[in-house]
Amino acid sequence: MAKHYIPNSAHKEEMLKEIGLSSIDELFADIPGKFIRDELNLPEGKSEYEVFLEMNEILGKNKTVLEMPTFLGAGTYFHYIPAHVKYLIERSEFLTAYTPYQPEISQGMLQALFEYQSLIAELVGLPVVNASMYDWGTAMAEAALMTVRLHRGKRKKFIVPRHTHPERLQVLETYAKGPGVEIETVKWNERGQVDIEDLKEKVKDAAGVYVEIPNFFGLLEEEVREIGEIAHEAGAYFVVGVDPTILGIVEAPGELGADIVVGEASYFGNPMNFGGPRAGIFAVRNDMKLIRQMPGRLIGMTKDAEGKRAFVMTLQTREQHIRRAKATSNICSNEALVAVAAAIHIASLGPRGIRELGEVILKNTAYLKKRLSEVAEIPFDGVNFKDVLVRFEKPYKEIHEELLKRNIHGGYYVGKHFPELGESALFAATETTRKEWVDALISALREVI
């Protein structure tokens, strides 16, 4: 019997005949000729080795944060990751970014995610945590929609500080557009923190009130508990966004009255990765009304038919693969591998390590702030964690370009988001920031400005 090998023109002719055409050209007859290319002007092909050499040359122009000290923060930070974290998540049992759709078969992955939930619950001070969202921004946006659902649509206003991270705010605005959620901002006071009086004027009929620890300017909001009380008195839910690396040295958001806590888990166990992938924290109080409305997957512990411990995905009727139209969220994948990496790192540090991490970051940030104050204006007084807002007289773009010439990556330009702050930038420090890097930065700034 004759074999039909590719290319098989008989199949092509059969399909053309079925649609009443005699050639491929007729299929594209409606497209103006000027838009159809006869051939692509591509160079001659190269061998794999030649491509390797060319790519290696291009990639060699990149510099790591160890070769070029960076003070660029504003949401993405250089943290040290213990070597065993990468080794463990690269094991074949874990190395997938996708959800186990036959979850009970994947007991190892489910247990790892259950441990992640337990560790985050201990950190944030709330007992119910999901198995992760995409990132902090989507977690915050999902929290806003959740507060509106909890009010059954009778309240559609969600209040955020104007100095919320601008990119997170953009995600929130995108999420809010479809369901018609109104986003209202509260101004900052002379110390760069939430203006309590402005909040009191705007909180009426709000579904939820949001605050960040630390805020976009790197400052610790001093009146978080009071903000929560104002929200609750007005019948609104209190949502707190938090950088979890600070939770060893400050009160947990749950202890400050938060109903919902969101944040960024990838600060543990994950490199910067050009900004992603991430894993958003999402936690709520032990209230079934809240639990049934929270987005994302929940891993629970139970017993199987033989009475043995088993891990399962629980309350799945909330999810889009069960009830798409009525799901609490239509996020259709998750960040399981990122969450497992975070869990391994957190477990490795333990309570003492988490506290020491926060203390070192706080100390390094204070040193950076002190030295920056010698060469530029610090607009807001207060305690900073990681980020420090600095204002210059000279255009910051020029300053940044000069720093790059001196092999130093400067801070994040804030003026494009908040013109009233002038030529301002956020400079960041973490536990990896070395004193000599800060000193080199200050010396360079003295030359430049």
From Swiss-Prot:
HAMAP family: GcvPA. SUPFAM superfamilies: PLP-dependent transferases. It catalyses: N(6)-[(R)-lipoyl]-L-lysyl-[glycine-cleavage complex H protein] + glycine + H(+) = N(6)-[(R)-S(8)-aminomethyldihydrolipoyl]-L-lysyl-[glycine-cleavage complex H protein] + CO2. The glycine cleavage system is composed of four proteins: P, T, L and H. In this organism, the P 'protein' is a heterodimer of two subunits. GO terms for molecular function: glycine dehydrogenase (decarboxylating) activity. It comes from the Archaea. PANTHER family: GLYCINE CLEAVAGE SYSTEM P-PROTEIN (PTHR42806), GLYCINE DEHYDROGENASE (DECARBOXYLATING) (PTHR42806:SF1). Its EC number is 1.4.4.2. Keywords: Oxidoreductase. Belongs to the GcvP family. N-terminal subunit subfamily. InterPro entries: GcvPA, GDC-P_N, GDC_P, PyrdxlP-dep_Trfase, PyrdxlP-dep_Trfase_major, PyrdxlP-dep_Trfase_small. This is Probable glycine dehydrogenase (decarboxylating) subunit 1.
